[in-house]
From Swiss-Prot:
The lineage of its organism: Eukaryota, Fungi, Dikarya, Ascomycota, Saccharomycotina. Keywords: Mitochondrion, Phosphoprotein, Stress response. It holds the Pfam family MBR1. Residues 1-20, 93-156, 199-224, 258-325 are annotated as: Disordered. The gene is MBR1. Residues 136-149, 214-224, 279-293, 302-314 have a biased composition (Low complexity). This is Mitochondrial biogenesis regulation protein 1. It is found in: Mitochondrion. It comes from Saccharomyces cerevisiae (strain RM11-1a) (Baker's yeast). GO terms for cellular component: mitochondrion. InterPro entries: Mbr1 (IPR031443). Residues 99-115, 199-213 have a biased composition (Polar residues).
Length: 339
């Protein structure tokens, strides 16, 4: 009975303060429920400077539906004047302190609501904003990872291209070195034929000169046809059979000098007594046989100068290739070069 009388009486100032203090608490719960249902968990990156103004606008436009319970009716009666005050007063008067302190408490409650709504560490939202942050950071760092992954295949392509260029250069140098040796050998044969042209047989010398010229000019053209040019000497270790400089290192110089001194007087004795055309024929025959039997690395100039003394020939460069036995590879190369 006593409670019914109190409800019929008008509320005092202290009771009004209590009711005003209870009202915003229920308001906070409703707003939390509303924000939890509406707010996107992945929108933390949005601008939050004017969040308080948005919350105040939501407070003013939010309609509380009254229920049958007496507590909700009292809250409805107390919240209606608050909404009128918020709508009527400007923004500066909302922040100013009032006599009963209800507006200041409501403002403090709205600030606390803003802090709770936009708190990224709050457990009510399931930690989704932190996951969103991780995604954004991984998105920004993925550009650097993509750059690194793009640089690695570029480096691999560069290394492959450099390796191909080096291989092509080495193969081209090895292929070009052999025709140079051929051209040098043909120039030696040209000199020998020019020395031979002093003899009465001029037809043979001119024919051989034309043959050497045709060979020297046809070598670069038939580079892919000849089997000797296609041999990769740097792979099979055949440089010592092709270049005369490496051939001299493998031979014994003393044996070659002795053999040269033993063979030289016989040729002089066979050439001196006859000054007729027989000597020229024998010289031409010996020259042709020496040029065909000896490989390209041998020095054939020694057979075309019969009147030089033996000491000068010994002081000059000896024939280093004659002091050892010919190998099968050397004979095959010599036959291919001669033919």
């Amino acid at each position: 009975m006593r409670m019914e009388k109190t409800t019929d009486k008008p509320l005092s100032a202290g009771d009004m303060n209590d009711e005003y203090s209870r009202g915003p608490i229920d308001d906070i719960d409703c707003l939390n429920f509303f924000e939890r249902a509406v707010q996107d968990p992945c929108c933390e990156a949005c601008d939050t400077e004017d969040a308080d103004e948005e919350l105040r606008a939501k407070l003013s436009s939010f309609n509380f539906q009254p229920d049958s319970s007496p507590c909700n009716a009292k809250c409805q009666q107390t919240l209606n004047p608050l909404c009128k005050i918020d709508e009527g007063l400007p923004a500066e008067s909302e922040l100013a302190p009032s006599r009963n302190g209800s507006v200041s408490e409501a403002n403090s409650d709205t600030n606390s609501i803003a802090s709770t709504v936009h708190d990224p560490v709050d457990s009510k939202y399931g930690g989704m904003p932190s996951l969103r942050k991780a995604k954004t950071t991984s998105y920004f760092t993925s550009s650097s990872s993509n750059n690194t992954t793009m640089r690695n295949p570029l480096k691999k392509c560069n290394t492959n291209i450099n390796g191909l260029l080096v291989n092509r250069r080495s193969s081209s140098s090895s292929r070009q070195s052999i025709p140079e040796l051929f051209s040098g050998a043909c120039t030696k044969k040209k000199n020998n034929v020019l020395l031979k042209s002093e003899t009465p047989n001029s037809e043979f010398s001119t024919n051989s000169l034309q043959h050497c010229n045709s060979r020297s000019f046809s070598l670069p053209r038939s580079r892919s046809r000849s089997s000797a040019i296609a041999i990769p000497t740097h792979l099979y270790g055949l440089e010592k059979y092709v270049s005369p400089e490496l051939d001299t290192l493998t031979a014994d110089p003393e044996e070659s000098i002795e053999r040269f001194s033993n063979n030289r007087p016989r040729e002089i004795s066979s050439c001196c007594p006859n000054d007729t055309g027989d000597t020229s024929s024998s010289l031409s025959h010996s020259n042709t046989s020496s040029s065909l039997n000896f490989p390209l690395g041998t020095n054939t100039n020694q057979f075309h100068q019969p009147r030089q003394p033996v000491q000068q020939q010994q002081s000059s460069k000896p024939n280093f290739g004659a002091g050892r036995k010919k190998s099968f590879i050397e004979m095959s190369l010599a036959s291919s070069f001669a033919g």
